[in-house]
């Protein structure tokens, strides 16, 4: 029987899956649940060494002899510090050493309890990875614990070998050994490159062809990649391709971009048909919260993430494989390995996408965004502010030749204007910036810089505060809360924009919007000055129109059985 501590069970099961069989065990009470579970499983070759300093070096020797990772397990407190010299040796000799330390719960560190010191990160830069496991009480705790252990064990051989540290907090009671078997655990594997002549990749390609419901999701990328026509033909029909405007042109064909609206409009009982078996992601961040929730609620059997850095990014909680290589090289290689058979899954998504019309909003900030996107000149650049702006833009079709930029690395509202102006200063294209009022006024001294050129055109959406917070489902605000959450204001940018040399126009209704948009997007006569259009709308009306649109979308879709 094994320990009842779920973080220990995850750890031991994953040590087995990652092939760490040589374990050096040091005496102690806090680590006894780990020791008991390891010592009573036939997979492990256990060695008893009392002195932790010697135990660490003993484990280094085991790893050096076979070339495979070895582990050392110790109790809490200064016992862990005694392994430090061995960790340093393993780091500089590039030995795959796993240091497993038991610990007291974080609440008791620094409270004069026995054998306690701050153990997480104690080895500093001398380990390739250091993780602090959670004690598991919820499904999310279990997912997080599993991911951390996988991350640590994957680093043993990532870009060279070296030591890792796994700190395991264990609450009392310590000695409940009531678990008859180890759990089945999610194992994350990493492939570095994709050599088609290497037999270890046969399994990967076999798994790829096993699934008929395959989804490819392209995240943010600030580039255009032109696939050969042959590659497009081989790849496109085998997957449902999802991308957002910030993905630009990185898909071999036309991706589905209105998937957020599709997921909203599709009744819950019909969503099962849309659930993929395999998801492959590449590129950076994804804006759609609805897509993330959908794939977390309905996890695919496998999720592969392709990236040059090979980092673990478990966005949907179902990551199984990291493929460390250029995404486009990966796509071009698998194109020739896909079995040529009829795949119906993409058609379900494509049908729903085709039958969802673009919205037609009355005068509002959504109408202003749509009006600009429909009028964008070819070969221009579109910079989207964060929060509501980037989300509302996704409701419309952006011309393929338009570059789309947005600060989605951390998705904050600060710096969007400065980033866009910096980009425009180095660009020969017309650069259109769409930004909300809070984001603009937060970063308004971006206009103070002396790098404002006539290729710059700013569309400021001013509805007197952060209306997106007003639209959050389930969040009902009283007047006092509303003031602070939405940061209501009565500020105009006119004085500052004209002071900084912009040709300024104010818009208050649909007629003014149409007239101003024509001048704002025209390319026949180059403007002598950068342009600034401030569109004033009503917060409450913006929210009402948005909710009305989604309500109609759901009703219309159900009526048409989309």
From Swiss-Prot:
Molecular function, one GO term: magnesium ion binding
One biological process term in Gene Ontology: menaquinone biosynthetic process
Record has Glycoprotein as a keyword: no
Source organism superkingdom: Bacteria
Pathways per UniProt: Quinol/quinone metabolism; 1,4-dihydroxy-2-naphthoate biosynthesis; 1,4-dihydroxy-2-naphthoate from chorismate: step 2/7; Quinol/quinone metabolism; menaquinone biosynthesis
PANTHER family: 2-SUCCINYL-5-ENOLPYRUVYL-6-HYDROXY-3-CYCLOHEXENE-1-CARBOXYLATE SYNTHASE, PROTEIN PHYLLO, CHLOROPLASTIC
Lineage: Bacteria, Pseudomonadati, Bacteroidota, Bacteroidia, Bacteroidales
Keywords: Magnesium, Manganese, Menaquinone biosynthesis, Metal-binding, Thiamine pyrophosphate, Transferase
SUPFAM superfamilies: Thiamin diphosphate-binding fold (THDP-binding)
Keyword Metal-binding: yes
Protein name, UniProt field: 2-succinyl-5-enolpyruvyl-6-hydroxy-3-cyclohexene-1-carboxylate synthase
TM ranges: none
Signal peptide span: none
InterPro entries cross-referenced by the UniProt entry: MenaQ_synth_MenD, THDP-binding, Thiamin_PyroP_enz_TPP-bd_dom
Cofactor names: Mg(2+); Mn(2+); thiamine diphosphate
Organism: Parabacteroides distasonis (strain ATCC 8503 / DSM 20701 / CIP 104284 / JCM 5825 / NCTC 11152)
């Amino acid at each position: 029987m094994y320990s009842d501590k779920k973080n220990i069970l995850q750890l031991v099961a994953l040590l087995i899956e990652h092939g760490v069989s040589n374990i050096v065990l040091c005496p102690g009470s806090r680590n006894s649940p780990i020791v008991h579970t390891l010592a009573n499983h036939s997979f492990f070759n256990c060695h008893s060494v009392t002195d932790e300093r010697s135990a660490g070096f003993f484990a280094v020797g085991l790893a050096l002899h076979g070339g495979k990772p070895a582990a050392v397990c110790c109790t809490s407190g200064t016992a862990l510090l005694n392994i430090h010299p061995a960790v340093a040796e393993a780091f500089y000799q590039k030995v795959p050493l796993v240091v497993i330390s038991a610990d007291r719960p974080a609440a008791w560190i620094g409270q004069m309890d026995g054998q306690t010191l701050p153990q997480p990160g104690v080895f500093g830069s001398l380990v390739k990875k250091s993780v602090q496991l959670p004690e598991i009480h919820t499904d999310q705790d279990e997912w997080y614990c599993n991911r951390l252990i996988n991350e640590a064990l994957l680093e043993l051989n990532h870009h060279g070998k070296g030591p890792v540290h796994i700190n395991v907090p264990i609450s009392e009671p310590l000695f409940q050994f009531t678990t008859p078997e180890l759990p089945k655990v999610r194992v994350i594997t990493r492939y570095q490159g994709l050599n088609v002549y290497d037999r270890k990749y046969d399994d990967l390609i076999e798994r790829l062809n096993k699934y008929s419901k395959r989804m490819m999701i392209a995240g943010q990328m600030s580039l255009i990649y032109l696939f050969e026509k042959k590659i497009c033909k081989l790849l496109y029909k085998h997957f449902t391709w999802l991308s957002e405007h910030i993905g630009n042109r990185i898909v071999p064909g036309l991706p589905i971009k209105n998937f957020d609206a599709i997921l909203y409009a599709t009744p819950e009982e019909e969503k099962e048909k849309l659930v993929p078996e395999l998801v492959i992601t590449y590129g950076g961040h994804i804006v759609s919260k609805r897509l993330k929730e959908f794939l977390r609620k309905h996890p695919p059997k496998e999720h592969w993430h392709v990236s040059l850095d090979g980092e673990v990014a478990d966005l949907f909680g179902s990551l199984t494989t990291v493929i460390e290589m250029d995404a486009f090289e990966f796509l071009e290689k698998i194109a020739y390995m896909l079995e040529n058979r009829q795949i119906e899954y993409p058609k379900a998504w494509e049908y729903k996408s085709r039958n969802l019309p673009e919205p037609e909003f009355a005068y509002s900030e959504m109408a202003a965004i749509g009006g600009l996107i429909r009028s964008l000149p070819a070969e221009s650049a579109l910079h989207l502010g964060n929060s509501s702006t980037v989300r509302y833009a996704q409701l419309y079709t952006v011309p393929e030749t338009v570059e789309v930029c947005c600060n989605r690395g951390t998705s904050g509202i600060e710096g969007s204007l400065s980033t866009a102006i910096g980009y425009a200063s180095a660009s020969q294209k017309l650069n259109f910036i769409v930004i909300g009022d809070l984001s603009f006024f937060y970063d308004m001294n971006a206009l103070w810089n002396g790098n404002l050129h006539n290729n710059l055109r700013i569309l400021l959406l001013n509805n007197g505060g952060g209306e997106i917070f007003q639209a959050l489902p389930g969040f009902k605000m009283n007047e006092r809360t509303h003031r602070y959450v939405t940061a209501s204001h009565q500020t105009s940018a006119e004085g500052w924009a004209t002071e900084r040399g912009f040709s300024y126009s104010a818009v208050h209704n649909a007629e003014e919007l149409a007239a101003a948009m024509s001048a704002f997007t025209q390319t026949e006569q180059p403007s002598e000055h950068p342009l600034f259009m401030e569109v004033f709308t009503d917060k409450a009306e913006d929210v009402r129109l948005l909710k009305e649109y989604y309500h109609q979308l759901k009703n219309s879709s159900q009526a048409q059985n989309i």
